[in-house]
Amino acid sequence: MKVLAALSGGVDSAVAAALAKEAGHDVTAVHMALSANQAQNRCGSRGCCTVEDASDARLAASMLDIPFYVWDMAETFEETVVEDFLNEYRKGRTPNPCVRCNEFVKFKELATRADALGFDAVCTGHYARVITGPAGVELHRAKCIEKDQSYVLAVMGREALEKVIFPLGEYESKSQVRAEAEQRGLPMSAKPDSYDICFIADGDTRGFLRSHLGSKAGKIVDTEGKEVGTHSGAYQYTIGQRKGLNLGRPAADGRPRYVLGTDMKTNTVVVGASELLSVDAITATDAVLLTEPDDPTLSGQAEVTLQYRAHGQQVPAKVYLEADGTLRAELLEPTRAVASGQSLVVYLGDRAICEATIEEAFRQEKGQ
């Protein structure tokens, strides 16, 4: 096949491209420049699209003896990922920019360009597995559970999955991937992993939000409406947060308090005891299917597990898909700190079967 390999400059994408070539594919490499200010990003930065990353991507392609190009996707990334990130926080929601990037940049814009240029598939260094099942392609967790990225890939949908290659999905550990790079003499074999939001180079998410959304003083109140502190912008807080509250009045029982919610209209943050974060029902919208629409799993006929943050816990549940794309989940065990805006992925075993965006999480009344 004619394969377009996305090279980020890291070890994972370099090894994935090498494996694709060694599998007999005709591989061309591309580095996606996602930052409009790449030259300002210093070497060793924690952010994306540093000069060092672009240089490492070019070096990897040269060592693998494959053609290399740089595609400027900064405008698309800014509009669909960064602006979405800011807009979601303006609404008091908790977005996952990696999900949006995969949806709009890596597996939409990149795939569209690849298809127009006659490529048969796109290859990346993501940790996930694409398996051909009885009814078509399926997305499964990677064998290396610690690095599994199926959660942020489920938004792709089945059609996009038909034209991707994830060579690293079968590896049991990241150390094995680094060993593959070392065997091939790739110098990025020891390059550290990146865990932060890629466009926030210093890792200071609150500072980034403040610089773009500004500051506005507001109240922090308890569940009875009593003021217990102040803040400089309700958008800076997410459900379940405990650190950084700086409450002026301790709770009567002396217990720690957590963010229970925000009211963006009144710029108010509500805090309370940890047990008030517990929920047993979730409503999500804009469902993306990775299975057949009539799959009985989506009508509550099988126990599934839910994941609502990257590398988060798996929660047993039953789910019900409605005709308008709304997904209702009834949790078989309560969970906590579920925020609107997060991506909800439904798994049957290690297979992802549906993704949707959380609108509401709540505690059902007894007998409901």
Locations of regions flagged by a protein language model:
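ATP-dependent adenylation/nucleotidyltransferase module used to activate substrates
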Residues: 1-155, 174-176, 182
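AMP-forming adenylation/ATP pyrophosphatase catalytic core
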Residues: 11, 123-368
